[in-house]
C-alpha cells in the first residue's frame, strides 16, 4: 500500500479501521473517559465548515452516540460496534455513507493548543472558496513552516485567533466549549434518530483490526498505559496504531536501506506532532496528538526487538 495512502487513511480516522475511535475524549477537556457529552463540534473542510450536533452516552460496556449534521440531511447513530446512517432519501443516504467528515471522531480534539501560542497567523485577504466568501487566514506552525494551512473564515467564525482552537483540520470556537455539556445525560429522544429518516445503511466496525498487533513481538515495551491497537504492512514499511485511550499515535517503521523513504516529505496535518528515531536497521517516525517534546520522549522510551 502506498505510504501516502496509509497516512491519509489513518489521519482521516476511517470508522471501519478500528472500533473505539469514537470512544476517545478530549484530553484538553479534562473529563473522564466515561463522561456523557452533549453539544456541537465544528471542523474545517476543503468545502467550508461542517457542524454536527452531538449526543453521546458511554458506560463501562456500551457506547451510544448520535450525530446530527446541521448543514446536511442525515444523521448517524453509533451503538457499540454498529454504525447506522439515516436519511430521508437515497441520495442523502449515499452522501452520508461517503462523506469524509464522518470519518472523524465526533468529539473534541485530543490535544488542543491556542493558535496564538503554536502558530503564526497572517491575513491573506478575502476570497471565495466553494461558493462562499470568507476571510483567508494563513497559519504556520512555529516549529515547522512546511506545514502551513489556510482557513476560510466568514464573519461569524472570524473570532480573534487566540480564541480559536485547531487540531487536524477541526476548528472548535471557544464559545462552543461553554455550550458543550458533559454532566447532563442525554435523554432517550436525543439518542433516537429523527422520524421520517427511513433510508438506512448499517455498518459493523472491524474489531479484528484492533487485535492484529497483540502478538507482534517487534515492539518489546511501550510507555505505561499505551497499547498496540493495530498494525498494517505496506510496500515501504509498516505502521502501528498505538493509543492510551486519549492520545493516538501512528508509528511508521521503515528499513534504513529503503531507497523510497518518503515520510519526512509528507506534510503533517494541523497540530499533529512528529518525532523520528533511527537504529542500525530501521527508521522510526511517530505522528501523534501529543506536544512535540512529549512525542519525542515517548518515541525514545519505546523498546524494539531490533
Where in the sequence are the language-model features?
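Sec-dependent signal peptide recognition
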Residues: 2-9
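Short, surface-exposed coil-to-beta transition loops
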Residues: 49-53, 71-73, 145-149, 172-173, ...
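An acidic-aromatic
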Residues: 52-106, 162-184
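Intrinsically disordered, low-complexity linker/loop segments enriched in Gly/Pro
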Residues: 99-148
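Short, hydrophobic/aromatic-rich segments at coil-to-beta transitions
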Residues: 34-40, 60-65, 131-138, 159-162, ...
Amino acid at each position: 500500500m502506498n505510504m501516502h495512502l496509509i497516512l491519509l487513511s489513518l489521519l482521516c480516522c476511517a470508522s471501519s479501521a478500528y472500533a473505539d475511535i469514537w470512544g476517545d475524549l478530549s484530553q484538553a477537556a479534562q473529563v473522564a473517559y466515561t463522561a456523557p457529552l452533549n453539544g456541537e463540534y465544528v471542523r474545517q473542510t476543503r468545502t467550508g465548515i461542517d457542524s454536527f450536533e452531538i449526543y453521546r452516552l458511554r458506560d463501562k460496556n456500551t457506547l451510544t452516540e448520535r450525530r446530527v449534521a446541521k448543514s446536511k440531511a442525515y444523521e448517524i447513530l453509533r451503538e457499540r460496534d454498529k454504525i447506522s446512517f439515516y436519511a430521508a432519501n437515497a441520495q442523502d443516504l449515499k452522501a452520508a455513507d461517503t462523506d469524509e467528515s464522518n470519518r472523524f471522531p465526533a468529539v473534541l480534539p485530543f490535544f488542543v493548543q491556542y493558535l496564538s501560542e503554536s502558530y503564526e497567523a497572517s491575513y491573506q485577504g478575502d476570497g471565495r472558496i466553494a461558493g462562499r466568501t470568507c476571510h483567508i487566514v494563513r497559519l504556520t506552525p512555529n516549529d515547522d513552516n512546511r506545514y502551513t494551512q489556510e482557513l476560510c473564515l466568514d464573519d461569524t467564525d472570524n473570532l480573534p485567533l487566540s480564541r480559536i482552537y485547531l487540531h487536524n483540520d477541526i476548528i472548535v470556537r471557544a464559545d462552543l466549549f461553554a455550550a458543550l455539556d458533559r454532566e447532563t445525560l442525554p435523554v432517550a429522544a436525543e439518542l433516537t434518530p429523527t422520524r421520517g429518516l427511513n433510508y438506512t445503511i448499517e455498518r459493523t466496525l472491524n474489531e479484528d483490526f484492533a487485535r492484529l498487533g497483540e502478538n507482534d513481538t517487534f515492539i518489546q515495551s511501550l510507555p505505561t498505559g499505551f497499547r498496540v491497537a493495530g498494525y498494517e504492512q505496506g510496500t515501504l514499511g509498516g505502521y502501528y496504531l498505538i493509543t492510551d485511550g486519549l492520545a493516538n499515535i501512528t508509528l511508521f517503521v521503515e528499513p534504513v536501506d529503503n531507497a523510497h523513504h518518503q515520510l519526512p516529505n509528507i506534510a503533517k496535518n494541523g497540530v499533529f506532532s512528529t518525532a523520528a528515531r533511527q537504529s542500525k536497521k530501521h527508521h522510526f517516525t511517530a505522528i501523534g496528538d501529543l506536544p512535540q517534546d512529549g512525542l519525542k520522549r515517548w518515541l525514545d522510551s519505546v523498546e524494539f526487538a531490533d
